[in-house]
Amino acid sequence: MATTPRPLPGDLLPGDLPPGSATNDDWWRDAVVYQVYPRSFADTDGDGMGDLPGVRDRLGYLSELGVDALWLSPFYTSPQADAGYDVADYRDVDPMFGTLADFDALVADAHALGIRIIVDLVPNHSSDRHPWFQEALRGERRDRYVFRDAPNDWESIFGGPAWTRTEDGQWYLHLFAPEQPDLNWENPEVRAEFRDILRFWLDRGVDGFRVDVAHGMIKADGLPDVGPKEGRQVELLGDERVPYFDQDGVHDIYREWRPILDSYPGGRMAVAEAWVASPERLARYVQPDELHQAFSFDFMMADYHAKSFRAVIEKSLAEAELVGAPTTWVLSNHDKPRHVTRHGGLARARAATLLMLALPGSAYLYNGEELGLPEVLDLPDELRQDPAFKRSGESRDGCRVPLPWTAEPGCGWREPWLPIPEDWRGLSAEAQQDDPGSTLNLYRAALRLRKEHPALGGGTLRWLEAPTLERREDVLALERSPGLAVVLNTGEEPVSLAELGLAGEVLLSSGPQPDPGAVAPDTTIWLQLTPQTP
């Protein structure tokens, strides 16, 4: 199935990025990456689905926002049983989203603006419409997938059994939807195919890959039963007891991929979506000869409380440092409720974001969070498209509602694939553009300062100590050297800067500061410290 990509006429490669962009091979260590969920981002042909030309049209908006790179969720040829995470052709663009020429133009224009492109890679499973699986259903070459004569007790992440019976009586494994059969990564042909897929997109100029279900692919020998347990197996996600995730053999795959990435110029990279049992297990994915980044989902799932945030930050930084990798922070994505809703309101979400953007390492944003969008909780059941909803009653559609661009009815969309709430007109990019206190302009200011301030981005942090902090477990204070303090107040009462032993200029605050000498509740500030005299 190997193919030769056609030459790209005059496209900018990463080594050709313009002055002022992140041009070194380690650009990813402190990059801010913006996740684009293409079907929900921007629509240019009026069919209600976002597309690649829509992303291209909004590159100016993304450049003004200040992001370093875009991560594009799947746009490949797919029957869309799981919103593109069921891939039928890994080397082409689904007509819903455009063409390969549209993709090439997007890459070229993004590179011209100094924005890098990361694409989703889905290696654990393909679509059941993939030519390989169609061959398998005919009884040919079933060794590319996982077939057996009788199922074990494994359950699908989406609910129900992880096995479906074929017409001839065998069963095939699908850890997600039945339309997403698991590939057999013990087969050398599967491994060779994905090495070729990597090269195909690298040759087209992509700067990296987000590896979907990076903890998957390899299963325990013999496919043993999970055994008796309480509740659904999905509740064990990230537990070392699960015989189909986080197996040691998956690291052999990444050690095969790393030399391919390193053989291309410009610092090509890969980031793991790995749900594992601990930061120690996560650090194994970012060893020097494997992947470059792995999302800190512990940070995303932490309770909104200073003590919880600090515990996760300390552990994550310590484990990543042992293998020389940066920590990769994230608060929202296409699989989890938006953090405005998860943390209990916009003020808290803004405070958590300003904390995240002050931490050493890389940060990933999810499209629409810069507008302060909440989770949509009242979508009609008949409009939901998430396969998990059909099998378990749980749905991710609420975080996938299309973005509001204008304050007009429809928010810039004509009959979007999911309805946009009427009150989102006030949250639209147009409505927030000229409002200095808007969430959009908070993100712009934070990303600008992150680029300009020598203390932000890479480096280390130091926890600040004060008697007040011993009494106030709902307050977190840290210093980024040189001279920047970050204070988060998750409590219900203001905290005095003087009591923390801090003095200086507030460069940025996530919310109003009625008392300039204190940090208000549910607020994070970035404070330029006044130099102390000897």
Where are these regions (language model features)?
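Active-site and adjacent substrate-binding regions of carbohydrate-active enzymes
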Residues: M1-G504, S509-P534
